[in-house]
Each structure stands twice: as structure tokens, then as C-alpha cells.
Design a protein with these regions (language model features):
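A generic structural signal for short, solvent-exposed coil/turn residues
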Residues: 80, 115, 125-127, 179, ...
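Functional beta-strand-loop-alpha-helix junction segments that form "active/interaction loops"
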Residues: 95-97, 108-154
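Extracytoplasmic/secreted envelope proteins and their assembly/folding machinery
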Residues: 13, 17, 69, 73-74, ...
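Non-catalytic propeptide/linker segments at domain boundaries
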Residues: 1-110, 116-120
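Second-shell loop/turn segments in exported
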Residues: 74, 85-94, 135-142, 184-188
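Catalytic cores of nucleophile-dependent amide-cleaving enzymes
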Residues: 155-227
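Acidic/glycine-enriched edge-of-secondary-structure segments
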Residues: 48-62, 131-139, 153-163, 180-181
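Extracytoplasmic
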Residues: 82-83, 128, 157, 165
Length: 227
């Protein structure tokens, strides 16, 4: 499904449209609810790309409306005090060590204030919308993460954005910590794409930014700053 948006060949699109419509009608007749839902969701991909008087996709898509994938309301990205708070989990391995150092340097400019504790850092925006980024130091995987989680719990905060930074075999640890009100989860480890279903099982409405193959700090860190 994620490849459909890049297809521009009109003949290929026509074939795909026909296949989706055929399967939807077939599964509907067979009373296959799950299969029908899958092709109903796929019909959304063709609503704005339909040709001539092909209104079938629009009528089916209304039954399987999808939320926006590339936009989140600002109100959902802040706590009750209008501050957006992030929690970034680093792990004690060679990847975590290099990534943490690069991560902190990314925010070393006049727009941000870096508060350095012995086991974690807090990065705060100096202008614009208030943002606070909490990250444990990679060498303090256990006590640093526990301390930050304690700070959030004591203040009744939710991490609006959660980020996993470390090898993929640590990803499950971060995924298990997803809060009900977390809106964005960034999974930058290699092959993070394979963990999408696990994340969705934890929170069905969460927006996910994930690497497909190789995760690199040279992409992840600048991207986090842009968020």
C-alpha cells in the first residue's frame, strides 16, 4: 500500500484500481469482513486519482475513512500546560554512545538551552512553542531512564513524543513504555519498519516515524530537530 503513492503510470494505476475493486466486490459477496475492510481501506488511495466518472472508490472510501497521516493537531502534542514534552531512550551500546553525542551537538545553538544532569539531559526551546526534550545518557540506560520516568510520573506528564535510539534488539523495551496519550513514536533503529504492528498494538492512534532499512544518526538527529 505504501508504494501506491509513487506510481504515476496510468496503465498500472488502472490495473491496480480494477484489482482493488474486483477483490472488494468478491470479498463482500463472500461475507469476508476482514478482507473487505482491507480493500475498503485501500480504496482510499485512489479517491483523488480516479478517472472519468469513477465514483465507486469515493463511495466505498467514505465507509473506511482514514485519518491524516502527515498532520497532527498542535493541541495533541502538548500537555495541559501547553508544553510539548519528549522522552528519548538511549541504550548502552556503541550505537547509543555515538548517537547520544551527535544528538546533543545537534541542539547546540542559540535556539536551545541544554541542561546537563549527571545521568540525563533536558533540552528546552528558547523561542517559539515551548518544547522540552528529556533524554537519558547512554551510559545511564537504567538509572537515567528510571529517573526521567519518575519525573514525568511525579508531575503527571505524558511524553507527547517518544523516541527510540539504539539497536533494533532494544526496540521492544522502548515500545513497552508507550503511554496512552503519546502521539508520535520515532523508531530510528535499523529495520524499525518491522516493529510497526507491535507499536500499533500498544496504541492504535499513534503516528509512527520509522526507518525501513538502515537507521543512521546523520538522518535521525537532524530530523528530530525539524520536528
Amino acid at each position: 500500500a505504501d508504494a501506491f503513492g509513487s506510481i504515476t503510470d496510468s496503465l498500472v494505476l488502472k490495473i491496480l484500481r480494477g484489482a482493488v475493486k474486483y477483490e472488494y466486490v468478491r470479498l463482500n459477496a463472500a461475507k469476508d469482513v476482514k478482507g473487505k475492510a482491507i480493500y475498503g481501506l485501500l480504496s482510499n488511495l485512489f479517491v483523488e486519482r480516479s478517472i472519468s466518472n469513477e465514483n465507486w472508490f469515493a463511495s466505498v472510501a467514505k465507509q473506511y475513512a482514514l485519518p491524516s497521516f502527515d498532520r497532527i493537531e498542535n493541541s495533541k502534542l502538548v500537555n495541559r500546560d501547553s508544553v510539548s514534552r519528549w522522552m528519548i531512550y538511549f541504550y548502552d551500546d556503541e550505537d547509543g554512545e555515538a548517537s547520544f553525542s551527535s544528538f546533543v551537538k545537534t541542539f547546540n545553538d542559540t535556539a536551545w538551552r541544554i541542561v546537563d544532569s549527571s545521568i540525563y539531559v533536558i533540552i528546552e526551546s528558547k523561542k517559539g512553542k515551548p518544547v522540552q526534550i528529556y533524554a537519558n545518557k547512554n551510559k545511564n540506560e537504567y538509572d537515567g531512564q528510571a529517573k526521567l520516568e519518575s519525573i514525568f510520573a511525579d508531575n503527571n506528564w505524558d511524553p507527547n513524543v517518544m523516541v527510540h535510539r539504539g539497536h533494533s534488539y532494544y526496540a521492544y523495551k522502548t515500545i513497552e513504555k508507550i503511554h496512552d496519550n503519546t502521539q508520535v513514536f520515532v523508531l530510528g533503529s535499523c529495520g524499525g519498519y518491522h516493529s510497526l504492528s507491535t507499536i500499533i498494538e500498544r496504541s492504535s492512534d499513534i503516528s509512527i516515524i520509522s526507518s525501513k532499512q538502515i537507521g543512521t544518526m546523520f538522518v535521525n538527529n537532524p530530523m528530530l530537530k525539524l520536528l
